[in-house]
Swiss-Prot record:
This is Photosystem II reaction center protein X. Involved in the binding and/or turnover of quinones at the Q(B) site of photosystem II (PSII). PSII is a light-driven water plastoquinone oxidoreductase, using light energy to abstract electrons from H(2)O, generating a proton gradient subsequently used for ATP formation. GO terms for biological process: photosynthesis. Keywords: Membrane, Photosynthesis, Photosystem II, Thylakoid, Transmembrane, Transmembrane helix. Belongs to the PsbX family. Type 1 subfamily. Pfam families: PsbX.
C-alpha cells in the first residue's frame, strides 16, 4: 500500500465519519422537533 493510497483511504474514512455525524445530528434534531411540536 502506497502512502498516497493510504492517505486517500483515510480521507474517505474521515469523510464517511463526518457525513455520518451530520446525518445523525439531523435525524436526532428532527426526532426531537416532532416530540416538541406535539
Amino acid at each position: 500500500m502506497t502512502p498516497s493510497l493510504a492517505n486517500f483511504l483515510w480521507s474517505l474514512v474521515a469523510g464517511a465519519v463526518v457525513l455520518g455525524a451530520l446525518f445523525g445530528a439531523i435525524i436526532f434534531v428532527s426526532q426531537r422537533d416532532k416530540v416538541r411540536r406535539r
